[in-house]
Amino acid sequence: MATATEIRKDLRTPIVCVMGHVDHGKTSLLDRIRGTAVVDKEAGAITQHIGATEVPLQTIQTLCKGMIGGNIVVPGLLFIDTPGHHAFTNLRSRGGALADLAVLVVDINEGFQPQTVEAIKILKQFKTPFVIAANKIDRIHGWTAKNNSPFLQTFNSQPDHVKGIIETKTYELVGRMSDLGFSSDRYDRIRDFTRNIGIIPISARTGEGIPDLLMILIGLAQRFLEESLKFQVTGPGVGTILEVKEERGLGYTIDTIIYDGEIRVGDTIVIGGREKPYSTKVRALLKPKPNREIRVEERFDRVNKVTAASGVKILAPELEKAMAGSQVRVTKESNVEDIIKEIEQEMEQAKIVTDEVGVMVKADTLGSLEAIVNELREAKIPIGRADVGDISKRDIINAETVNDPMYRVMLGFNVTILPDANDYLQTTDIKIFNSDVIYHLIDDFRKWETEQRALAEKKKFAEIVRPGKVKYLPNCTFRQSKPAVIGLQIMGGMLKPGVTLIKPDGSKIGVVRQIQERNENISIATVGKEVAVSIDGPTAGRQINEGEIYFVDVPEGHSKVLEFQLKDTIKQDELETLMEFLAIKRKDNPFWGR
């Protein structure tokens, strides 16, 4: 199908964000599209840094093999590769997400995973149109690969049982999408893409289905984004910082996506800094060659100007103060103060509202901080402080001011623990969790919290006087007094040395000194046991008599904890004994222990 290409000069390249669960094939998909091999350089084949790849229309037309019909007006696609998917929240322009479209990569064999669901929630939050690339169709048993073929062409040549598996796996994805509130189907069965999410089965390894994916993305951009892609061709550039990094021979640089206007060498720019916004001057602009991802440091072109939408590396003084996720805005010298005020207001709006008591959160960028705070809020984990930057000694000192041991905790997302903080950490009980995957952070914290609560409960239990009901056994008076030694049967709860015993009328008997079973001292006697007990205070035959029932005298504060905090954790016989004991105490004072 022949394609007319009258690229509109007032439309910028649509920005496409690639998201998905770890190892589901995000980077492999981009590699297949651009024909480079960044994956091989990545630790564990997982994307570690944010990148951007400009894929010109000519490349897309070659890959699509004439599938795209009609007049193409967009100049290509700019793909952003996000580590995990949380950097997506970093890539935002004022008032919404920076990405115009998103590709959610899902392993068709594994289906939705925790990060897949997190990604969909974020896309929904930012109202970003997206498609699903159901990757790894080549892993389906019996699949015969046809490299770089359109999906329907390769699908129709497969055996019937393989087609059946693809259909089943696709409808499993449709079902999961329905659970999350989205209508979806395989892309070739959709007539209205405004109401349905397209699922495109692909293989990043063989290239199958990728022509269909590019065709759908170009179609969506043409049909639904034309208005939002209009930009000021010569207006002052506006962009978002993807990453701040120090390059050998260049010093500090900022990898930036320019999404409006243009930026030139020599321009004054205002940048959102870690402390506050500030201005600097562009010394150089490095533009990746088309099809080359911005992370691959070799062979950049030095250019005089860059027009939206584009990934560019900016060289300028004082970039070490810049903060990833914040804005870059080109301005005249005379307007610098006004723009600084505008960015300050935006940063103020982005500040996190914290709880009175909670964990401390540190993240590498504003967007990351927002992402982790959203997840913590959903997990109902209170946040005491939230800030951008590495973990310092001052942060640990601040965490030490928290009294609740459950919240003397710091959660670090994509940050490092500074050396002075590491040294100080050895002298304190502050707990730090650090990860670059949000759900790992939350899982690790939850696991630790459960363990700590169990330990605290155990400790609380160990310190609390527990209820007990005992019977003075007939013919079991071994010594009458100083101390009285008698035989007792534990009828409910437990008996430990050191507790005071009372009668059902509330009168005190004395203090249990020792408990013996078969002539051996024991530290606890539980329900059903018959033991010899020495008691300081009473004389057998006078204050105490065989056949009588006695109760452990539980202090009022302890009984409150048992009745109102630990009620669900104690055994039935102990609970019944507690209730009998409370009835004795409340006979004269109904509010005792309440």
UniProtKB/Swiss-Prot annotation:
- Could you tell me the superkingdom of the organism this chain comes from? Archaea
- Which residues belong to any copy of the tr-type G domain? 11-226
InterPro entries listed in its UniProt record: EFTU-type, P-loop_NTPase, Small_GTP-bd, T_Tr_GTP-bd_dom, TF_aIF-2_arc, TIF_IF2, TIF_IF2_dom3, TIF_IF2_dom3_sf
Q: Where is this region: G1?
A: 20-27
State the Gene Ontology terms under molecular function.
GTP binding; GTPase activity; translation initiation factor activity
Renumbered to this chain, region (G2) spans 45-49
Q: Region (G4): which ranges?
A: 135-138
Q: Which SUPFAM superfamilies match?
A: Initiation factor IF2/eIF5b, domain 3 (SSF52156), P-loop containing nucleoside triphosphate hydrolases (SSF52540), Translation proteins (SSF50447)
Which PANTHER family does the record associate with it?
A: EUKARYOTIC TRANSLATION INITIATION FACTOR 5B, TRANSLATION INITIATION FACTOR IF-2-RELATED
Q: What is this protein called?
A: Probable translation initiation factor IF-2
